[in-house]
Each structure stands twice: as C-alpha cells, then as structure tokens.
C-alpha cells in the first residue's frame, strides 16, 4: 500500500466516511497488527478506542477466593527484576502500569487518566515527546498518594545501570520530567514511532518512590519490598513464599469502582503443566492454569469433562533453541560464558548449520503441540508484515552428515565425530516439561545419526526461569552449550523483541545477568540496522529492517527457531477473563469475575 493511499484512508476515518473497524481490518490484511494500526491512527490524530472491558459485578468483593496455578513458581515480586513471565505476572497482582494492551491492540488506561493523543495534546507531530496525564486519587497500599514523582522515580531507577533492571532498555534513552503532580512528559532523543513502551504493559509497572528511593543503584537487590510489594493494584500483599505461593487480599481503596470481585487471590507454583491442566479442567481444584504447555491430545481429553475450557490467544511468542556463542566451561574474571570467549564447537559455522537441519520441527508440531504451536524458520513471526518470507526449515540427516564431513568432522570408532582433538558432543538443557523433553529427544535422536553426542539436561522450571541472580542454573546465566525455551513478545512492536540480539544487551556478571541478549551473539551489522529501525518513522522501511534483523539472526544459526506458540491457558467454565496476546495473562486481573 502506497503512502498516499494510506493517508487518504486515514482521512476517511477522521471524517467518518470509513469506520475505524473497517480501516483496522484493511491494515491487518496487509500485515499490520491491530496495536500498530491503533498507534498509527493516534499519531494521525485519531484517538484509540478501546472497547469497554466486560464486567458485571455491581460491588467490590463477595467473590470468594481466586485460585491460580502457575507450574513455574513465582520467585520475586519486583517487576523491574522479573526476567521470566511468571515473575512478571506475580508482580501484576500488586503493581500497575500507566496503561496496558487489550485483545484488539488498543491501549487501556490504568494509572493514566487518558491515553495520549493529538486531540488531548499528548502526542507531537515530530514523534519526540509524549505527555501522560495521571489518574488522581490513587493511593499506594500503605495509604500514600500516587503522583508524578513516582513515575519519574521509576525512570531514574530503571535507567541506572547499577540497578541492573531487566527493564532498562525501555528507559535508558528517554528523559522523563514532572510537569505537575499528575502530569509527566516523556522526551525521546530521536523520532520514536513506537512511543508506548516506557510505563506501559509488562515493563511499565510502577513501584513506589517512598519505599525504593534508598535502593536505587547497587543496593537494589537489598530492598525489603522486593518480596513484600506495596502497589496500587486490586490486591494488597498478604503472604509470599518464593518458589511456592503468593497471596493477596482485596484492596478496599482500589481506584476503580466495584472492583475487584474476589476477596482474596493466590498464585500457587509447582508441579507440571499436565497436573496444572488437570487441576483446572478435570478436578476443578483451581480456577485458572497458566501456560498449558501440554500435548494437545491430553488437553482435548481433559476439556471434554466440561468443568473448564482452554483459551488459545495468538501471540508473537517463539519456542527456540539457543546455541551458546561463548564457552560455558571457561571462567574469565570470575564469569563463565564470558563474551571474551568463543564456544569450542559452535564457533564452527558448519556445526551450527548441521544442527539446524537435524531439527524435525514438523514432527514437533504434528505429534506434540497440535493446535497449540506452528513450526517456523523465523525468530520474528508477528506482526505478519515483519515475518520474513526468505527462510524455510528442513529436516535432512543425510545433508547434516555431508556438511560435517566436508568441514573435517570425522567419525571415530565410537561413532562420534571429532576434529582437532575435540569430540562433537554437547549439553542441551531446558526446563522440566513433557513436551520439551519430547522435543529434546527428537533432536538427540537425529544428532546421534549424524555423529553428534547430545547430553540432555532438565532443570526445574522455577529454577530455570528464576530471577535470582545468585542462581547459576537460570537460563540467563546460560552455563550450558545449548538451551531451549519460549520467549514472549510482550508488546505489538518488534523493537523490544528484537533487542535480544544487540551487543549492549549481552547478559553478563556486570549487569547481574539481566541483559536480554542471553546468547551473547554479537554482530555490528545487526547493531547498526537496529539503531536505524529505532528511529525510522516510515512503517514500510521499518518493517524491512526488522525482516533483515530476523534474517541475520537465523542465517548465523546460533538461534534455531522451532515453533510459534500462542498463549494457552486453562480456565474454569464460569470464570470470565479478559485475554490479550499483547500483554501478560493477568494484565486486567481487576476485571476477573465468576458468572453466577
């Protein structure tokens, strides 16, 4: 679609000749996501129109106890340190952002009084600033007022390198100023097409200045409230046992009328995905089960009982294998997997290329995941307009053998290939989960036929995805040769998702392994294109840049995409849950209720 045609359509929306819904549908047809269309319209002077969240209760409380099951247990409750989805969701019960993303990709105000637009003077033509007006009368759980000072503090807290916040990328390149007690200005150093990053969604949850001001920087991990949250959310902290359970009780002073419905809430951790699915769909012991990474055949049988249902929500999430670009066995200055080292096996491109064609993605989809995943050769899969058409996956054991043979990796008497005195054997880890162990087995079996010895390692999910920086078995430490997990796309723009491979995001001891580039893979070309994409206002050019970034990552084979995975949750038949593929599962926990 040409720029002139696009501008004409936007003009028709402004005058009312074309409905907003019809415009969104046209843009989705050419590859844009609904959230990106909403941002485009807002920048053009057409405010976002979030649909009202369905909510029937006429008073707060009275709903009893809400039981949520996360088979990966919550380990901390500070959103700025939450490297895993389960810790992000745990924090979302107590903390809130200025706005969240609904299912249609519209911004929904939470702590904001309204969504910035040109009509309310919140957005500028040049894309260099945004003005947020805050909701008045909101109180922290300890009774202190929520003000612009808290918003400015969160910017200072997250952007300080010594704080080692996983959210630093959203805050380090902006400037936030207090205009008055309930208004803040966010200023960008360069034109920014996707302005709804800081203070929005997953990395937008706001913590109170009066409790964290003394813990900015190097003392950040010492704050008592890292484990005892005092937020603005619908539930007040009650109890927390890291790695086990988090409990909350109704906030009697919540800033939305008639909410929340439930008197108390718990997120119980532990077990596995199958037992979690059974506890919701079959026995009804729990109301909601997160991340049903279970064979689809099992889910369908459990769902047939009628006590619950499976919710499938499309996302940009990707299950993938990551090959370590560094050496996990060598310690440099007290740090393993240091960016100063190279992996002894994977530094050979032929080895990475061979592994790529030894992965039977089609079988993983067909025999394990079914309707809950789709095989893909791309790391970046959403929105459709940035999904590369340049790649395809292949399963070919014969080709893998030929690649290795040509590169000088010869089979020994034990059947394992070797070169320059190094055997082709490595350790491949993931979290304990039946589908993941089956995927591991598929890869191991194929590798054996190519003369590669693969040792499988499984780590308890609550440990593997822990945000504890002292835990050496987390996926962010990556003290292993290869690992597999699912990374989530927590906003509709590709920028934050693709910063997982910029050099300045490498996970290191210095940043307490909070950097998003866990593989430590580095490319100057990638860095340069990423910087260009950050400030490119032309949507078509920007999309082409993200496709190029995807292709660079995929071509180097340190990253092996496997499956596009939607969100899959289990819920009680009478539980009403606003879902969104662009935000966390608990993004609108205040609106959950039971149909009676």
Residue locations for each model-derived region?
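N-terminal lobe/hinge region of extracytoplasmic solute-binding protein
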Residues: 69-124, 156, 230-232
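Extracytoplasmic/periplasmic ligand-capture domains
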Residues: 2-18, 22, 26, 51-61, ...
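A structural "hinge/loop" feature
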Residues: 72-91, 111, 166, 195-205, ...
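C-terminal segment of N-terminal export signals and the immediately downstream linker at the start
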Residues: 39-71
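N-terminal export signals
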Residues: 22-49
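Active-site-proximal polar cores
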Residues: 562
């Amino acid at each position: 679609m040409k720029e002139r045609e696009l501008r004409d359509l936007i003009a028709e929306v402004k005058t009312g000749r074309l409905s907003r819904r019809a415009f969104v549908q046209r843009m989705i047809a050419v590859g844009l996501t609904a959230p990106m269309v909403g941002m485009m319209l807002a920048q053009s002077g057409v405010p976002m129109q979030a649909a009202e969240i369905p909510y029937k209760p006429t008073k707060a409380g009275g709903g009893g106890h809400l039981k949520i099951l996360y088979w990966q247990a919550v380990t901390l409750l500070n959103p700025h340190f939450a490297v895993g989805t389960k810790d992000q969701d745990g924090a979302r019960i107590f903390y809130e952002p200025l706005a969240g993303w609904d299912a249609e990709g519209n911004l929904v105000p939470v702590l904001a009084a309204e969504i910035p637009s040109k009509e309310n003077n919140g957005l500028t033509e040049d894309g260099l600033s945004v003005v947020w007006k805050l909701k008045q009368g909101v109180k922290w759980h300890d009774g202190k007022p929520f003000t612009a000072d808290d918003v400015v503090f969160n910017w200072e807290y997250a952007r300080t390198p010594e704080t080692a916040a996983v959210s630093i990328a959203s805050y380090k390149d902006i400037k936030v100023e207090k205009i008055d007690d309930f208004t803040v200005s966010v200023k960008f150093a360069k034109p920014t097409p996707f302005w709804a990053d800081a203070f929005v969604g997953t990395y937008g949850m706001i913590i109170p200045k009066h409790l964290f001001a003394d813990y900015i920087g190097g003392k950040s991990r010492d704050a008592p409230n890292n484990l005892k949250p005092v937020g603005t959310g619908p539930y007040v902290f009650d109890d927390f046992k890291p790695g086990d359970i988090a409990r909350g009780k109704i906030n009697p002073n919540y800033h939305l009328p008639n909410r929340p419905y439930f008197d108390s809430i718990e997120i119980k951790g532990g077990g596995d995905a199958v037992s979690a699915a059974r506890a919701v769909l079959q026995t009804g012991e729990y109301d909601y089960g997160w991340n049903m990474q279970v064979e689809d055949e099992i889910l369908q049988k459990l769902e047939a009982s009628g006590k619950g249902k499976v919710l499938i929500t499309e996302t940009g999430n990707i299950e993938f294998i990551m090959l370590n670009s560094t050496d996990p066995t060598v310690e440099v200055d007290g740090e393993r997997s240091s960016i100063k080292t190279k992996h002894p096996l994977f530094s050979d491109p032929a080895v990475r290329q061979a592994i790529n064609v030894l992965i039977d993605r089609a079988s993983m989809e067909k025999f394990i995941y079914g309707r809950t995943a789709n095989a893909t050769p791309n790391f970046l899969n959403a929105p459709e307009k940035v999904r590369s058409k340049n790649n395809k996956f292949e399963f070919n054991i014969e080709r893998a053998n030929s690649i290795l043979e040509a590169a000088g990796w010869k089979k020994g008497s034990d059947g394992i290939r070797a070169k320059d005195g190094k055997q082709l054997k490595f350790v491949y880890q993931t979290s304990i989960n039946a589908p993941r162990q089956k995927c591991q087995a598929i890869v191991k079996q194929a590798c054996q036929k190519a003369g590669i010895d693969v040792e499988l390692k499984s780590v308890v999910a609550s440990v593997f995805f822990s945000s504890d920086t002292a835990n050496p078995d987390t996926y962010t430490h990556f003290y292993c040769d290869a690992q597999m997990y699912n990374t989530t796309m927590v906003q509709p723009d590709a920028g934050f998702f693709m910063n997982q491979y910029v050099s300045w995001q490498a996970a290191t001891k210095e940043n307490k392994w909070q950097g998003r580039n866990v593989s430590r893979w580095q490319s100057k070309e990638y860095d340069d294109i990423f910087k260009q994409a950050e400030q490119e206002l032309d949507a078509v050019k920007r999309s082409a840049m993200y496709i190029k970034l995807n292709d660079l990552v995929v071509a180097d084979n340190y990253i092996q995409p496997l499956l596009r995975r939607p969100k899959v949750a289990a819920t009680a038949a009478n539980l009403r849950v606003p879902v969104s593929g662009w935000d966390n599962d608990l993004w609108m926990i205040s609106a959950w209720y039971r149909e009676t």
